Each structure stands twice: as C-alpha cells, then as structure tokens.
Amino acid sequence: MGDIMTLKLLKEENGLSPMLREFRTLVRDSNIEKVAFVGSVGVCQPFAELFGYAIRDKECYFIPDGDLNKVKKLVIKDIGMQMEDFENLNKVDAIVLFGGLAMPKYGVEVDKIKELINKLSPKKVIGVCFMSIFQKAGWDKEIDFDYLMDGFIKVSIYCKD
C-alpha cells in the first residue's frame, strides 16, 4: 500500500436507500464480483446481510472481527440473505469494512485489519460507517480506503400523552 490519500466528497443524500444504491453502483462500476464484508459480530452482521442483499448477484462473504477462521458465505434463502459456514477465503475483489470494527468496545485492532487487507489483496477497500466512527477512531489515517460511506443517524422517539 502506498500513502494514504485524502478522500474528496462525491455526493450527499439522506437515508439508507441512497447508501445502498450508491454501494450497488460502486460495485457494478468497479467490476467487482467477490466481496468480503468485515465487521463486528452482532452489530455489523445485519449490515453485511443488508448490503449483501443489495448486490445479491455477486459472491459475498462475512468475516467476523476480521477472523479468517470464521468466514461465512452470504446466501439467499427463503427469508432473504443468510449466512453459512465457509472455508478458505483467500482472494476478493473488494473488502467492505464496517464501522463497528473501529468501536473501542469491540477491541478489533486496526493492524489486524490491515493484515487481512494485505492477505486478501482487494482491488477496492470500502468503508461503511455511521457517525464518523472511522474518522473519530483514526482509522481513516491507517486504512487506505478507496471509498468511505459515512451515514448520520438522527433518532426521534414519540409517545402518547
């Protein structure tokens, strides 16, 4: 890997649908066929299924906590995207890192993820996070992201009087 490049803003939109649409377009336009989603167990796993569903015509995998000994293959079953055990993932076209990895409470070291990236040699490294967690944790200075999708969540809670 060369020097970490500064990323420039390409587009801003509201909602999860535009994020999924832009992701699908990015994968298609980059001729990506094999994608490894990497994220924290529990928190990132549903996002891997959601983003995997957006590119369901591609070969998709989930690597929990960056551990290649626990790789799951994403498959379409009767209720949508699900995960099955898989062995021996050694090369992918793209790695998608989810922001949960950078959250201190999950304890995934950035160096472990850098080793994983080197081992799988992807054409593209894509970050997907919310609330700028990669930037807050300094991972944007450590990981050579080709693209970074950063969403912001505003929560409104209502109740009856």
From Swiss-Prot:
<dbReference type="InterPro" id="IPR009183">
    <property type="entry name" value="UCP004962"/>
</dbReference>
<dbReference type="Pfam" id="PF09897">
    <property type="entry name" value="DUF2124"/>
</dbReference>
<comment type="similarity">
    <text>To M.thermoautotrophicum MTH862.</text>
</comment>
<protein>
    <recommendedName>
        <fullName>Uncharacterized protein MJ1183</fullName>
    </recommendedName>
</protein>
